[in-house]
Amino acid sequence: HVKLLVRQFLRRANTTSQPWFLYVGFHDPHRCGHTQPQYGAFCERFGSGEPGMGSIPDWQPWYYQWDEVQLPYHIQDTEPARRDVAAQYTTMSRLDQGVALVLKEIEMAGHADDTLIIYTSDNGIPFPSGRTNLYDPGMREPLIVVSPDPKARRNEASGAMVSLLDIMPTMLDWYNVSTPDKEMTNDIRFWDNDNPKSFLPVLEKEPTPSADDAVFASQTHHEVTMYFPMRAVRTRKYKLIHNLNYGMPFPVDQDLYVSPTFQ
């Protein structure tokens, strides 16, 4: 169980004065209907307490009516697609409750007031034009940051342009570790032009928007058989996607291909 593993880690961390880093990954809300169809398209029935589904003690399932869910703009308005989205929303609620358990463990270990918490995802929504694409639905990921710094803003949404590339320099900044010198890196360009950079300053003050604001993205293969290299740059006004091998057929991920939405 994730919460027990987190508890075990924090107990070890409390035996030393050294700073620690904990990465917790959840399967939710990934698809799993292509490998475990008995649990539903997103394994939304797994652990629900239904006959044959097992039970997750800390999870109270939330269900959504397929004809009432709000659809993202890029998903077709059909009953199969709506049922697909409703199933994912159920697993999102399971994820939400799982994150709450992790936060509770951090609090119980006495680290609620000295831990920087970053919540995000690894890719966009697994629907058409989403994951494995560099269209906006494929790049949009949640980013919630909670800082114990008393100077940090609370309960505010930011318009700062950041990407997951910024997490590493942010963590180095948090630990007061200097970023590598250019001559020490394999790719000197990685540290040029302040990109990526720490977003800790954003937690204290909203940056002034600039025409030079930009984030970068890349996609090469989601699976070893899904090679289709793409690169993208997004500014506040424009976006450019460069398909490096545009003449080849675009590969569709297996779990998306067999999904109710795609079929």
PLM region descriptions:
Residues 238:
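P-loop NTPase catalytic cores that bind/hydrolyze ATP
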Residues 169-172, 199-200, 204:
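Two-component system phosphotransfer/interaction surface
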Residues 225-229, 235:
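Extended ligand-binding clefts on enzyme/binding-domain cores
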Residues 196-201, 212-215:
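Polar, glycine-rich mid-to-C-terminal structural blocks
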Residues 9-168, 172-193, 219, 232, ...:
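Active-site-proximal cap/lid insertion segments
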Residues 209-212, 216, 228:
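His-Asp-centered acyl/peptidyl-transfer active-site segments
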Residues 2-7:
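Acidic, His- and aromatic-enriched active-site or binding-groove loops in soluble protein domains
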